[in-house]
Amino acid sequence: MSVFYPIHCTDYLRSAEMTEVIMNTQPMDEIGLSPRKDSYQIFPDPSDFERCCKLKDRLPSIVVEPTEGDVESGELRWPPEEFVVDEDKEGSCDQTKKENEQ
């Protein structure tokens, strides 16, 4: 004698729903490619690539020379200006240290 209990597992129900969705979908052969372009495209169109290369040949190169002016925001320089010590100041610091030791 066997007794069957109803299954109340939500995972089982999700699995059954997914199986039903998979069984009811159209085969890939029936899905045709539309001639219109969608708002997104996985692979680039080869004609777009050729057009891009032609435009690229016409673009001018821009050369930017560095300036000695103020540092722009976000740009890091090493060592920072507040840590740069003049040689004259270093010499006076060494003399002060020697005098303090004596």
From Swiss-Prot:
Keywords, A to Z?
Answer: Cytoplasm, Nucleus, Transcription, Transcription regulation
Its transmembrane ranges are none
Q: Does the keyword Transcription apply?
A: yes
* Lineage: superkingdom: Eukaryota
Q: Where is this region: Disordered?
A: 66-102
Which biological processes are named by the entry's GO terms? regulation of DNA-templated transcription
Q: Which GO terms describe its cellular component?
A: cytoplasm; nucleus
A Pfam family annotated for this chain is Lbh
| Listed Basic and acidic residues bias regions | 90-102
Q: Which InterPro entries match?
A: LBH (IPR013294), LBH_dom (IPR038990), LBH_dom_prot (IPR042945)
Q: Where is this chain's protein located in or outside the cell?
A: Nucleus; Cytoplasm
Q: Which cysteines are joined by disulfide bonds?
A: none
Q: Where is the LBH domain?
A: 18-101
This molecule's function is given as: Transcriptional activator.
Identify its protein family: Belongs to the LBH family.
The identity of this protein, by name, is Protein LBH
Q: Encoded by which gene?
A: lbh
